[in-house]
A protein has these predicted regions:
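Sequence termini and other peripheral, non-core segments
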Residues: 1-43, 47-112, 116-232
């Protein structure tokens, strides 16, 4: 979970996303925006049910908390499947999954993550992330000549959560190892890209490699020290 604030302009930051992140971060940004809606406007509902295994001989208690928004109805969807046990015998299992009828967006996830907290801290933060999400969707379409399925949530996200605080853009959350952090959040994320993402970072045309990235990766005399172990 992260928000790659590679520039203070969210659309420029989106253009700086490498191909892997253009594909991956669309869903992550949608999850963060969805979590903002559910944590601020949703009503916590606890669903409890039993999964049934071993032809009815074993019952496993399950519990899930959802945050339905107005217009959504929580329910448990059950599915019966036939499986083969270790001895080769067939048996039925009944598995329940907590879901929402009339779902408007993704479920709440990682709500205590620094980026999730930042996204719902002020309406300015929320709308900045909406623009980053929109920018990455545009990058995806530009680079791969097709639309991402998550684009269906674009219109929903245009309206901020009803209960979000009004306020200015706050400093970006820095979800990265301390070795990349400096006083400037954007430079911190650029450090993170150069030091941790260079091994897989590429940009499919018509996108271009950011100059700050290519210059620093190619400059052997850079003051920035890359870590000895590259993190995935």
């Amino acid at each position: 979970m992260n928000i790659f604030a590679l520039d203070r302009d969210p659309y420029v930051a989106a253009s700086f996303h490498c191909d892997k992140h253009v594909v991956k971060m669309i869903c992550e940004y949608a999850q963060l925006l969805s979590t903002a809606h559910r944590q601020l406007d949703g009503t916590p509902v606890i669903l409890e049910w039993e999964n049934i295994e071993d032809n009815g001989n074993t019952k496993i208690a399950k519990r899930k908390t959802l945050h339905p928004l107005p217009g959504e109805t929580p329910y448990v969807e059950f599915e019966t499947v036939t499986v083969r046990d270790d001895e080769g015998h067939l048996r039925d299992e009944v598995t329940g999954t907590a879901s929402l009828l009339g779902r408007l967006c993704y479920n709440s996830t990682h709500h205590n993550h620094p980026c999730a907290i930042w996204a719902r801290q002020t309406d300015a933060n929320y709308h900045w992330l909406v623009q980053l999400f929109d920018g990455v969707l545009r990058e995806y379409e530009k680079r791969y000549q097709k639309k991402h399925a998550t684009e269906k949530l674009r219109e929903f996200f245009l309206i901020a959560p009803k209960n979000i605080d009004k306020g200015v853009l706050t400093p970006f959350a820095l979800a990265m190892p301390d070795e990349y952090k400096v006083d400037d959040e954007v430079l911190s994320y650029q450090n993170y890209y150069v030091g941790d993402k260079a091994r897989f970072a590429k940009w499919t045309e018509p996108a271009t490699v950011p100059k700050w990235f290519s210059n620093r990766v190619q400059d052997d005399e850079s003051n920035f020290q890359r870590p000895s172990r590259v993190r995935g």
